[in-house]
A protein has these predicted regions:
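Basic/hydrophobic alpha-helical interface regions
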Residues: 1-70, 74-111, 117
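Negatively charged
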Residues: 103-299
Length: 299
């Protein structure tokens, strides 16, 4: 039986987004709300088809924070993060995805990040793939992210003991570090609301020689680092299995249709005919790939 109070809070938060964030609200209407236990997810997550949430997390935060995390998850779907991890380490990938979207969440959509939320001006305009490469090859940069998350966890868990994420709990089966499904020839990149856009590494050749997909970055044990609030999970089917190539293509098409509809709704309702979808429709039409990544595809 679901927690009715938490479910109603989620519905209410989503409904209120219709007033100021029509595009994001439209995206969220395409995602089923699924309640799970704390040992499956300690905060909130998305796999591209669902919004998965821990009811206690929803009850413990303010409604405006629920809205912020919901939009955060919607942005993961807009930029197809559940389909783009490849062989990258799932925790570092989550951190990279958060850095990629949170600047847009703050500056373009006007939301505040919860304690421990990841944002760094140096990453503005970079894709998740480029940020991942920086984190996986730069121990200091990765440690900065870990410190930010730990500070947030300490404040939010003050007086309530250690969180599930820090103690190794609160991870789904797929978060044990396996590979996400092959995304075929998928190409997609995050938008760049501020600064010079960096090129995106996309497609099926995710693991390149300079990415170090091992278990450590310097002295940092990758499996021991915390997960950020508002996770991105690999896309999966109803049985929790990796998607087939045809299912990946189908989900991509579903997401692109949802983004197109959200973009049109925002433009129709805005005074100046613009949309806050972060230029996502433009990136669907014209994708650029870093020459280094193209070269690595053949090495």
């Amino acid at each position: 039986m679901i927690n009715q109070q938490a479910h109603e809070k989620m519905i209410k938060a989503r409904s209120k987004l219709m007033k100021g964030q029509l595009g994001m609200a439209s995206m969220l209407l395409h995602l089923d709300l699924v309640e799970v236990s704390a040992d499956q997810c300690s905060t909130m997550a998305t796999d591209g088809k669902r919004i998965i949430y821990n009811p206690q997390f929803v009850l413990d935060i303010e409604e405006i924070e629920v809205q912020s995390v919901l939009v955060h998850e919607a942005l993961h779907v807009v930029w197809e993060h559940p389909l783009r991890r490849g062989k990258r380490h799932h925790k570092v990938w989550n951190i990279a995805c958060d850095y990629a979207i949170n600047g847009f969440l703050i500056y373009d959509l006007g939301f505040e990040l919860p304690e421990g939320g990841l944002w760094d001006r140096n990453y503005m305009g970079m894709s998740s793939e480029v940020i991942y490469r920086e984190l996986i090859t730069n121990e200091e940069a990765l440690q900065d992210a870990i410190d930010t998350m730990n500070e947030g966890n300490e404040e939010s868990n003050e007086g309530s003991g250690e969180s599930g994420e820090e103690s190794g709990e609160g991870e789904s089966d797929q978060e044990s570090g396996g590979e996400s499904p092959d995304t075929g020839d998928q190409e997609s990149e995050d938008s760049a609301p501020v600064g010079k856009p960096e090129q995106s590494m996309t497609g099926k050749y995710f693991s390149s020689p300079d990415e170090k997909t091992g278990e450590k970055v310097g002295d940092i044990d990758l499996d021991s680092i915390p997960m950020p609030s508002g996770e991105v999970w690999d896309a999966q089917d109803d049985e929790g299995k990796p998607l087939s190539e045809s299912e990946i293509t189908e989900l991509q098409q579903e997401i692109q249709r949802a983004v197109s509809l959200a973009d049109k709704l925002e433009k129709a309702m805005s005074c100046d005919g613009t949309s806050s979808m972060g230029g996502r429709m433009d990136t669907l039409k014209e994708v650029k790939v870093d020459w280094k990544d193209q070269l690595n595809d053949f090495l």
